[in-house]
Amino acid sequence: MAQNETPIILDETEQKIINIIDAHRDQIIDFAKDIYTHAELGYKEFRTAEKFANFMKDLGLPTKEHLAVTGVKAYLNEEKKDNVSLALIGELDALRIPEHKYANPETQGAHCCGH
């Protein structure tokens, strides 16, 4: 840390997030690679939703599934202890771009939205 820098102080929730990410780094990378190579089009992400829900459960996080067709919520703090709530939103649907280098041959979908 540079001499003038203020140290970053994390609260309990922030530290819990960092710890989960650090402890599961390789699993997170493998998950991302798997989703990338098995792209599914919007409202048809059934494999993706199931894989995400199972991944969150493996991390010990309670989930709610089948929200708005393929949506999944995972709770870091389901009981809202200390009035803290956290949302992580990710769009995991793909665009139909069959000519893309990494397009899923089954769905012709590719993750190349850029958002």
What feature does the model see in each segment?
Residues Q3-C112:
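Acidic/His- and Gly-rich active-site-bordering loop/insert found
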Residues H115:
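Short, conserved phosphate/pyrophosphate- and ester-handling motifs at nucleotide-, phospho-/glycolipid
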